[in-house]
């Protein structure tokens, strides 16, 4: 797939909200003297021109990073930076603010530092080849999952009364939050990142780490050693 062709049909959106509760300044936590955001930047710039990579944030550090690396920056309004704010609202603001006419948007979270350019390209190729409206990344495993409803437990991925061997269980697909791709015009209509004809793109579990708390951050640091 030609890089020039991809850059004509896709833009990249990276949301960065200041004020993480579990890890202070999470997106700029230093790992090997590089901010967490750098790991996404390093992989996406192997595919996309910097003019097609947009960072939406209320964080001065994000603005400084964008300026340093010549990425596009959107000042996210305070109303879209609350704890209850949805990423979808930030995407709609981005589309309107930058008058986006590109056919498709790729949503990447900085909290998925193990996601590679190969993962992103594979997801783009599946999106194009299957003529999808939206696609999202997952990892696969076999697991015994339970749900607790009030005080009662329910097995949801297996029948505990007729327990199978782990290798005989059906696969469980976990949305890993690393990659979302969707058509711009239909996103405006549905105001959701998954809609229409959709499918998933499978990633390795090792590439699917999502930095949500200090435990995840430590796991990533140990992986890099």
Each language-model region and where it sits:
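Active-site acidic Asp-centered loop
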Residues: 108-110
């Amino acid at each position: 797939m030609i890089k020039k062709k991809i850059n004509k049909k896709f833009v990249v959106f990276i949301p960065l909200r200041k004020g993480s509760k579990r890890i202070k300044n999470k997106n700029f936590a230093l790992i090997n003297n590089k901010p967490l955001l750098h790991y996404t930047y390093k992989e996406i710039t192997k595919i996309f021109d910097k003019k097609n990579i947009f960072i939406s944030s209320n964080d001065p550090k994000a603005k400084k990073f964008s300026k340093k690396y010549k990425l596009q920056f959107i000042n996210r309004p305070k109303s879209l930076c609350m704890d209850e704010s949805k990423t979808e609202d930030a995407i709609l603001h981005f589309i309107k603010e930058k008058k986006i006419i590109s056919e498709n948007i790729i949503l990447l979270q900085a909290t998925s530092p193990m996601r590679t350019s190969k993962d992103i390209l594979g997801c783009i190729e599946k999106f194009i080849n299957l003529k999808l409206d939206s696609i999202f990344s997952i990892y696969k495993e076999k697991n015994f999952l339970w749900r607790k409803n009030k005080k009662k437990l329910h097995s949801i991925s297996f029948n505990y009364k007729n327990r199978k061997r782990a290798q005989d269980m059906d696969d469980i697909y976990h949305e890993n939050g690393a990659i979302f791709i969707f058509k711009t015009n239909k996103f405006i209509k549905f105001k959701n990142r998954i809609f229409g004809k959709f499918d998933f793109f499978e990633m390795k579990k090792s590439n699917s780490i999502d930095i949500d708390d200090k435990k995840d951050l430590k796991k990533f640091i140990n992986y890099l050693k």
